[in-house]
């Protein structure tokens, strides 16, 4: 190998991370502010070698460098015998045509739904040898066995997990991932600060997994019934860090899915043109904080939606400050509302409280419209407050008092 070529990272005996570090990406799914990784894994059995997932189109040079390095380390012939494709999405399958071209005799193991998806994405695979798998199916690599577990809609219809039995490693694809990009030799959860890891884990769940929360709980039940839960020693997702403490992330997912992660916390989201709605937002915050409620404030001039929904995930209440423009809500508010519609936060075990407020001219109505939208998104709207132009001291006092009242409702909420 050339000195500058990418190196593999060993994660267990005969198992290597051979993925890609994407230091520069900032807009994949709109929330990769710290970059991301496209994790791929090699499993060396005594007789066969399996490659689990791959990388985004145009990024495969790193992956090939790491794959070659792993083969050299193992002293094995450069030959991939088994290709496992846990998920169709291009950040995990983009190099599949290259891999198939280089190793045309290697069968591609995936779900039945994935076969059609892969052929649609990559017409060059139309004659590839696909092996359709179902939950419980296995492939023997010689001393190492891979077991497949279908996971439809976690998070695409084609998704599946792969479990390396003897090593206790669950290759979970997108589930349990995070959009983080740390150096190749820092692949494990324990290699980075815990608060960074868990914050990224919460953000990933909020933006990708929230609408699937009921399926998450159902899949955990299935894993328990199959007797796999106690066998999992490590979780190797397709983005970010590898979990050597799998129960930490499993519990986090359970708490997110059931609402048990919720704190006495409120998220205030607002935009403003002439700072009237901003003044109201700050007054609401003071009222909430006076009762000991944690407050997170987002100003849509500068803040983006993926950070906002991360904080909504463990909050009990949201407040939306809405300026009126031509008798309609300010456009930036509409953006986040449409995003919330898809995320369906009411599937996470409880309904979060909501308050809408804002300044208006003319006939107004934006506050009521967003209240209606929030109700459709699964929030319990308990108050609306709309006023003309610049708020007076009395009106700001009203905002403060409504914040205090909301704080009391938050404290009364019990999530079982």
Swiss-Prot record:
It catalyses: 2 reduced coenzyme F420-(gamma-L-Glu)(n) + O2 = 2 oxidized coenzyme F420-(gamma-L-Glu)(n) + 2 H2O + 2 H(+). Residues 266-407 form the Flavodoxin-like domain. Fe cation 2 binds at residues 91-92, 174, 239. It is an enzyme of class 1 (oxidoreductase). It holds the Pfam family ODP. It comes from the Archaea. Keywords: Electron transport, Flavoprotein, FMN, Iron, Metal-binding, Oxidoreductase, Transport. Binds 1 FMN per subunit. Signal peptide: none annotated. Catalyzes the oxidation of F420H(2) with O(2). May be involved in O(2) detoxification, reducing the intracellular O(2) concentration to a level allowing growth at the expense of methane formation. This is Coenzyme F420H(2) oxidase. The lineage of its organism: Archaea, Methanobacteriati, Methanobacteriota, Methanomada group, Methanococci. The gene is fprA.
């Amino acid at each position: 190998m050339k000195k500058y070529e990418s190196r593999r990272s060993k994660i267990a005996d005969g198992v290597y991370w051979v993925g890609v570090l994407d230091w520069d990406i900032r807009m994949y799914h709109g929330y990769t502010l710290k970059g991301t990784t496209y994790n791929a894994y090699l499993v060396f059995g005594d007789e066969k070698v399996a490659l689990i997932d791959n990388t985004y189109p145009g990024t495969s040079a790193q992956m090939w460098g790491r794959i070659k390095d792993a083969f050299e380390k193992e002293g094995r012939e450069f030959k991939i015998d088994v290709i496992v494709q846990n998920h169709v999405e291009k950040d995990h399958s983009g190099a599949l045509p290259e891999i198939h071209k280089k190793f045309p005799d290697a069968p591609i193991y995936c779900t039945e739904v994935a076969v059609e998806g892969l052929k649609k994405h990559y017409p060059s695979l139309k004659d590839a040898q696909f092996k359709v798998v179902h939950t419980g199916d296995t492939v023997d690599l010689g001393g190492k066995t891979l077991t497949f577990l279908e996971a439809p809609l976690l998070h695409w219809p084609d998704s599946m997990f792969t479990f390396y039995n003897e090593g206790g490693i669950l290759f979970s694809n997108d589930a349990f991932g995070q959009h983080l990009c740390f150096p190749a030799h820092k692949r494990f959860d324990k290699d980075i600060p815990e608060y960074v890891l868990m914050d990224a884990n919460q953000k990933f769940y909020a933006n990708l997994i929230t609408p699937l929360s009921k399926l998450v709980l159902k899949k955990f039940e299935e894993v328990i019934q199959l007797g796999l839960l106690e066998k999992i020693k490590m979780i190797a997702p397709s983005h970010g860090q590898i979990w050597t403490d799998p129960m930490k992330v499993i519990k986090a997912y359970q708490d997110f899915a059931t609402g048990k992660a919720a704190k006495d916390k409120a998220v205030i989201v607002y935009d403003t043109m002439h700072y009237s709605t901003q003044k109201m937002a700050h007054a609401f915050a003071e009222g909430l904080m006076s009762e000991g409620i944690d407050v997170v404030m987002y100003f849509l001039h500068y803040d983006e939606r993926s950070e906002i929904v991360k904080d909504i995930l463990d909050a009990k209440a949201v407040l939306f400050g809405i300026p009126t423009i031509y008798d309609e809500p300010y456009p930036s508010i509409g953006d986040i509302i449409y995003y919330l519609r898809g995320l369906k936060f009411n599937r996470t075990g409880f309904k979060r409280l909501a308050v809408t407020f804002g300044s208006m001219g003319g006939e107004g109505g934006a506050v009521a419209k967003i209240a209606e939208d929030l109700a459709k998104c699964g929030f319990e709207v308990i108050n609306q407050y709309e006023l003309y132009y610049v708020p007076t001291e009395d009106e700001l006092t009203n905002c403060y008092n409504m914040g205090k009242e909301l704080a009391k409702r938050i404290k009364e909420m019990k999530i079982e």
